[in-house]
Amino acid sequence: MAEKHQDKMTNAMNNSKLYLIQSFGCQMNERDAESLAGMLEDLGYCPTSAQEEADIILLNTCCVRETAESKVFGLLGRLRKLKVAKPDLILGVCGCMSQQEDAAKRIRRSFPFVDLIFGTHNIHELPRMIHQVQENHEAVLEVWATEKGITESIPVKRKDKLKAWVTIMYGCNNFCTYCIVPYVRGRERSRQPEDIIDEIKELVQEGYKEVTLLGQNVNSYGKDFKNNYRFADLLMAIDDITGLERVRFMTSHPRDFDQRLIEVVASAKKVCEHYHLPAQAGSNRVLKMMNRGYTREHYLELIRKIKERVPNASITADLMVGFPGETEEDFQETLDLVKQVRYDSAFTFVYNIRSGTPAAKLEQVSEEVKSERIQRLIELQNLISLENNQREEGRVLEVLVEGETKTNPDLLAGRTRTNKLVVFQGSGHLPGQLVQIRITKGRPNLLEGEVVPNGT
């Protein structure tokens, strides 16, 4: 049963105090950062982008890839001088990396000036832990070994005013052999549907147009319930919310994307025609070593079923290169999978060792081979992305306007229902509007277009 968040301590802080949160990693971490920001602002802190101005700095860490950990350790080293100059600065490390016992100990040993270390299971305790640091003038290391249910009603400070992340579940039960997530995020726990629906209704009242439902595997939503309420049921309920324009979700596990879910996403008016389905590899031998729980044939049949019901569906994926034991033949099967599916885009990455996972003990592929293969994969996917986007030329697509582009204030940017980025001229259109755009140019990573007068 969800417990209510009660640790506010608003009067303990001064409004002039500033905070900075730097996040690494996935969308779940971005959403966690919004909760951290919400609690800090409840305590009277205001955001800043300047480290030297901050009274509290939180590094919200990731441990999925070694590069993210290296960035955190490098940043901590650079923050040492700032901590010496500002001894009252509260410096904290949280998130997936600090949830690992070895990493937390390493932080404490190598960076003793860090004031606060906590993990993924107790971020709602942040106000109390800050108060403890200030009152006792000593560091707090508090990493819960296991999850203790779901805490609702945590304050949230969202970065976006149009689109919102909405977490529907936490944890993962899949234990892919390369992945550390189940060890740092815990077992799967689903939020109650009424809590999710209430949150989305509040977002709509605040002017939000689009929500993205988050979970390590959203298709597993509800499997921990005693009744038969599942992800498809939740989508149908959300689709009925008045005023909401668009619904997205991620991430889906190909093994659990069943026919009922396909029928629901095909018929729901607000669920966008974009499905992120991480394949990871195209070789059955590698998929088995990864413990993915499906075959290449199952994956391709799933894609066929989705496109049969949703012909204009956009399919994206995660693809890994260099898993231990991957041969050139295995890699060729991944390339062939990409050619068959013709992803609109793909997040491609090189496998790197995660201590504590089964794959770390296997014979590794050389860095030289991994580097060569990832370049071949990227080149192939970029070509397919370009060809797919060029096919959009001449079509009129609905675009949710997000605002000015970062590089040119005369251009606006927005996204289609299939999650393609579109840039166009149209300064009269305010963010949040749905406009009809005729696509004039397809590029590998975006579409260019022009506003269709009166939407015709």
From Swiss-Prot:
State the name under which the record lists this protein: tRNA-2-methylthio-N(6)-dimethylallyladenosine synthase
Q: What does this protein do?
A: Catalyzes the methylthiolation of N6-(dimethylallyl)adenosine (i(6)A), leading to the formation of 2-methylthio-N6-(dimethylallyl)adenosine (ms(2)i(6)A) at position 37 in tRNAs that read codons beginning with uridine.
Q: Which UniProt keywords apply?
A: 4Fe-4S, Cytoplasm, Iron, Iron-sulfur, Metal-binding, S-adenosyl-L-methionine, Transferase, tRNA processing
- What PANTHER family does the entry give? CDK5 REGULATORY SUBUNIT-ASSOCIATED PROTEIN 1, MITOCHONDRIAL TRNA METHYLTHIOTRANSFERASE CDK5RAP1
The record, for CDD domains, names:
Radical_SAM
Entry-linked NCBIfam families: miaB-methiolase, MiaB/RimO family radical SAM methylthiotransferase
Concerning its family, UniProt says: Belongs to the methylthiotransferase family. MiaB subfamily.
User: Which Enzyme Commission numbers does its entry carry?
Assistant: 2.8.4.3
Question: What cofactor does this chain's UniProt record say it requires?
Answer: [4Fe-4S] cluster
Cofactor binding annotation: Binds 2 [4Fe-4S] clusters. One cluster is coordinated with 3 cysteines and an exchangeable S-adenosyl-L-methionine.
Reactions this protein catalyses: N(6)-dimethylallyladenosine(37) in tRNA + (sulfur carrier)-SH + AH2 + 2 S-adenosyl-L-methionine = 2-methylsulfanyl-N(6)-dimethylallyladenosine(37) in tRNA + (sulfur carrier)-H + 5'-deoxyadenosine + L-methionine + A + S-adenosyl-L-homocysteine + 2 H(+)
Give the Gene Ontology MF terms in alphabetical order.
Answer: 4 iron, 4 sulfur cluster binding; metal ion binding; N6-isopentenyladenosine methylthiotransferase activity
Q: Where along the chain is [4Fe-4S] cluster 2 bound?
A: C172, C176, C179
Oligomer status and interactors = Monomer.
The main location class comes to: cytoplasm
